[in-house]
Amino acid sequence: MKKKIFIAAAVLISNQLLAQQDSTKNLNEVFISANKFPNKTSLTGKVVVLITRDQLDKSGGSDLSQVLSEQAGMYVNGANSNPGKDKSVYLRGAKVDHTLITVDGVPLYDPSGIGSNFDIRLLPIDNIERIEILKGSQSTLYGSDAIAGVINIITRKDSKKPVNIDGMLSYGTHNTLHASTALRGMKDKFDYSVYYSYHKTNGINEATDTITTAHEADKDGFDQNSLYASVGFRPVSTATIRPYIRYSKIRGKLDNGAFTDELDYDYTSDDLQAGVKNEFLIGKAKLNVLYNYNSTKREYVDDSVKSRNGFDIYSKGNYTGREHYAEAYIVMPVKTAVTLTAGMDYRSSNTDQQYHSVSVYGPYDPLPLSKDSLKQNQMGVYAAAVLNARNGFNAELGGRFNHHSTYGSNFVFNVNPSFLLKEQWKFFVNISSAYKTPTLYQLYSEFGNKTLDPEKAIGIEGGVQFFAKKNKAVARATYFNRAVRDVIFFYTDPNTFQSVYINQDKQNDHGIELETTIRFCKSGVIKMFYTWTDGRVTTRSNGKDTTYFNLIRRPKNTLGLTIGGNIGKRLYAGTTVNAIGKRADITYDAFFNQVGIKLDPYILWGAYAQYSFLKNKIKVFADLHNITGTKYTEVYGFNTQGFNATGGVHFNF
């Protein structure tokens, strides 16, 4: 009852706060990710969500995972657990490795991981200009892993001034310090951007410990340093050359699993990206040529002075992954209403992995995995034609041919018609296929299988979107259905107890997304969403097919509400409520049998306020999370944060 009163009060107060200055952008936004060239929401049938820099600025105490969790169809498990805990991104209920993360359109992977998905903790939020979430199967333009969709992180670039300095400084609960600064500028044919960020927190005790006494339990903190630099050259008016480098390193502490505290378990994770992006104007066409090198390194050391589980004494694991990515594509109008995107990309990856441990049963030293044997490459050729007719009919038709060094070739396609009626009602349908290639670990590790095929998916979605006159509101209703076959499964023979990865399972997910954004009182904005997601796997058990719900740690129902606006010219205030439904989790008994667990639903209420002065050059802010102190669980056996607050200042000169 207390929670309901607090939430109702927040909504009523926020309604009274909204007045005067207009700070909202056009609701018919322009996106880049959907077609690889700028296009309005009303002119594409794809389902895209935009998070602007203004929205990110009004999330001063949040990290990337928390911002993503407030979007329709997104759930990031671990977003509100210990700040340094791993974050699992679930888009429309799909597996973590079925959502592709890109930075400025470049796909990012961690070849050393079992699923090869990139760790979003390595992406500082301060250097992000905007985020475009492209839902549905997108392998035609983006290749492997884009089964559920693509999250494109677009970094901040140069300033229009010769010299511009911006940054932020904040402090909050758990002794959390966050500082960042950037120097950007542009003059004549040259522009530059240099950014640095530091983030440190004591964190919380990651595991819900039932063994260690309170005074012995430790907090599992982490710190992060991030650096980014780029320069842009325009030797002629039709060409831009932009080399860049990004580096991020995390150091933190871990616990020894669910309900088990650990005092001496440390990890480091760092990521280095270096590359160059080139753009050339050729008449009305634009040619993009880019290269990116990505290196990830992870180390885990458990030097157990006192074993918390009575088994482990010492362990050390080192995992290094390297990825080369090159792409060239051209965007050109072929007729008044038709735009063609065509290109090719090349991906090459390898990994080194070593592990050593000592337990009560003695040392364990599996053979190290070397980049000389754990490597793969693939090349793709793709094309997509976009029609934007004057009568309101829009369509995209595309395909990709991909060749992989191990399994051979595969083909994917997309068909995406939509119709815009009277500039207000958009009806859309998407039919597309997608794939995920086997990872290096699944192919070549001790459990590897070189005969694995890629996971293959067919996605269907359809719906309607409404654009109110005078930019007053936008609303969208979407149904999606995703069928994946040849799902890679970790199989253990019940007779020999030998384990190997095989293609076996079928996965089917479907759901509904309802979203609306309403503008009122000039600057007032209300955003609401509701999502329902269901998913079932079909697998072989005792020689028979069996089907059951398997969206572990993912809610069937989510609800979000955000209200915000300006009070006068300088003060902004807003509030957010997120309701997460029941979830399933699993644990293991003493005989290593799976045991199902039900996680209770929960509601989180947050509030944000900022005050601007010196012509918006300085903004002080306060960001409150979980105001009611809700107790809940994201992962069985692990803690979540209670009420936490952050205060700070943004500056821009």
Which stretches of residues belong to each language-model region?
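Short acidic/polar hinge/loop motifs at secondary-structure boundaries
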Residues: 107-135
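N-terminal periplasmic "start-of-domain" segments of outer-membrane beta-barrel proteins
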Residues: 29-57, 88
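Outer-membrane beta-barrel signature, preferentially recognizing the C-terminal barrel domain
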Residues: 260-281, 319, 374-376, 416, ...
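Conserved C-terminal beta-signal and adjacent last beta-strands/turns
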Residues: 6-8, 19, 184, 232-236, ...
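N-terminal periplasmic accessory domains that precede
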Residues: 64-67, 87-90, 102, 118-123, ...
